[in-house]
């Protein structure tokens, strides 16, 4: 099947150089296989460019009192969903031949990753984008009840899962009853494409 339009979703706009390298490497791999129509969306952040890496000291990061109040009463997953749902729906309405989520350590029990994975997969499939793969993803080891529930529901809806290490494959099988295949971490080719 010829892939005319591919959507990549990962943490490519984070301030982590490894995440940026993963995104660059994945785009390079697709382009080197004659796939030119590539769109990108950040997995968890509603931004249009990579976060600049700060080298100075952080001055004041104090939020106004009203924001602090809402952060305390609204659960983090709901806050994330409110901030990102419009972006996810808009991107999901386009038609893609393939959606690649990954690489990186995206199967984690934290404030945003499980709800991000659930939201992306739910809305992509709702709008007809069912050819979704997780590529070169890593997994954490411990999951909260809600994160386990969200990942179990979501991972079953993904066409193919490629884990970047054997431990992640084992966790996917034992925790979520999901089979996956091994693939090398795509970030390792970054040095070859930058030289």
Predicted regions and their residues:
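Aromatic- and Gly/Pro-rich donor/ligand-binding loops
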Residues: 2-143, 153, 187-188, 193
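A nucleotide-sugar donor-handling region in carbohydrate enzymes
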Residues: 144-195
């Amino acid at each position: 099947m010829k892939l005319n339009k591919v959507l990549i979703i990962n943490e490519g706009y984070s301030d982590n150089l490894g995440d940026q390298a993963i995104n660059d490497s994945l785009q390079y791999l697709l382009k080197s296989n004659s796939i030119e129509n590539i769109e990108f969306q950040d997995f968890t952040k509603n931004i249009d460019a990579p976060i600049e890496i700060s080298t100075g000291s952080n001055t004041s990061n104090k939020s106004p009192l009203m924001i602090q109040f809402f952060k305390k009463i609204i659960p983090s997953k709901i806050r994330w969903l409110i901030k990102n749902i419009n972006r996810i729906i808009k991107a999901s309405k386009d038609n893609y031949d393939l959606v690649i989520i990954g690489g990186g350590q995206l199967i984690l029990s934290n404030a945003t990753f499980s709800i991000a994975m659930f939201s992306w997969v739910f809305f992509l499939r709702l709008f007809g984008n069912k050819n979704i793969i997780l590529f070169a993803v890593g997994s954490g080891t411990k999951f909260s009840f809600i994160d386990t529930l969200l990942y179990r529901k979501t991972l079953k809806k993904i066409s193919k899962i490629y884990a970047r290490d054997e431990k992640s494959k084992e966790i996917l099988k034992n925790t979520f009853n999901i089979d996956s295949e091994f693939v090398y971490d795509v970030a390792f080719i970054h040095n070859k494409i930058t030289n």
